[in-house]
Amino acid sequence: MDGNENPNPARTSLWRNARLATLREELGPLGIIEDGVIAVRGERIVYAGPEAGLPSELARADQVFDCEGRWVTPALIDCHTHIVHGGNRAREFQLRLEGATYEEIARAGGGIASTVEATNALSVEALVEAALPRLDTLLAEGVSTVEVKSGYGLNVEAELKMLRAARRLESLRPVRIVTSYLAAHATPPEFRGRNGDYIAEVVLPGLTAAHAEGLADAVDGFCEGIAFSPAEIASVFGRAKSLGLPVKLHAEQLSDLGGAKLAASYGALSADHLEYLDAAGAAAMAKAGTVAVLLPGAFYTLREKQLPPVEALREAGTRIAIATDCNPGTSPLTSLLLTLNMSATLFRLTLEECLAGVTREAARALGILGETGTIEAGKSADLAIWNIDQPAELIYRIGFNPLRERIFKGERILR
């Protein structure tokens, strides 16, 4: 079969002769099942296990696909991105290479202000067109779920416009989009020095409007000396909780302000970056079930020296996910496979931590682990089939895309 195949709700499909890395924890590292088979009815997995255990009624499938001994994993999940935005910062990158400081670039109209200006200038349709190539690059590597943030509008209508564009992507590609409202990302020039006014006049009204329109799946913020204080973020999180929305936080990227502990106190889905996280913050996150999302693309691009405290996260039992952080300024990265290699090479994550970090734990970081992230009965049939001899190849190789096919909600998407 060629191209995309839409699932019939009553149709049963089998993927046989597969080596499964299910990521189910009860099955041990990577949840491996040799000589595996996956049965899908409509959009849902109804069996994933050894061939010998396949129920006889499922063996009489409407269509059968031979994986020819290939590895099958859950489809990948990029749980932290900013792919909806206008413009790019290539000129700024060039200036940095020539020795310009961040302050000099900002004074010249660069930095986040340039992205805000470019984003505000575009319509929803133009933002969608700008985001599609970034999204397509991720999907081509086996990604089926992408988190998308606002945060480059910094006024109510522009933040809503970004979220509308993110929602539109889901109707144009076979992908699950999870949105995060991130108006508390930076303060625009007209509110400089008046963070409280910006939150009261833009962030909170925008949040209420986004919720009313069904545009926000979660609420994010940037807790840092150059952005918002813990108290300011708390006011945003309080409103989010009153609306029944989960929260997450950019925290401890440049300093330790206690953002991770704040996030944990609100039961946040995740706290992200975390280079300056301390042991107490890691413990608070573990207790709250808040996932640590590590972002090696930003670490690499900014030439950071402070590594996230991976060992402290392990000792605390904090779950770890990884993501591209695709954004125009500090992580212009649209390869989750390269992110896997960076996470292992720069942060010393293990094979199991890396693969769980873009599947099971990434789903946990988005609050959708009940829907996707592992291969097991009851979950969405979101799968990736790879031309590899062993799972380590997904992390070890650089500039290598071994995806054979992607399956999203039971639909085959062939490369």
UniProtKB/Swiss-Prot annotation:
It comes from the Bacteria. Its cofactor is Zn(2+); Fe(3+). Pathway: Amino-acid degradation; L-histidine degradation into L-glutamate; N-formimidoyl-L-glutamate from L-histidine: step 3/3. Keywords: Cytoplasm, Histidine metabolism, Hydrolase, Iron, Metal-binding, Plasmid, Zinc. Binds 1 zinc or iron ion per subunit. The keyword Iron applies. Fe(3+) binds at H80, H82, H250, D325. One of its GO terms (molecular function) is iron ion binding. GO terms for biological process: L-histidine catabolic process to glutamate and formamide; L-histidine catabolic process to glutamate and formate. It is found in: Cytoplasm. N-formimidoyl-L-glutamate binds at Y152, N327, G329. GO terms for cellular component: cytoplasm. It catalyses: 4-imidazolone-5-propanoate + H2O = N-formimidoyl-L-glutamate. Its main location: cytoplasm. Zn(2+) binds at H80, H82, H250, D325. This is Imidazolonepropionase. The lineage of its organism: Bacteria, Pseudomonadati, Pseudomonadota, Alphaproteobacteria, Hyphomicrobiales.
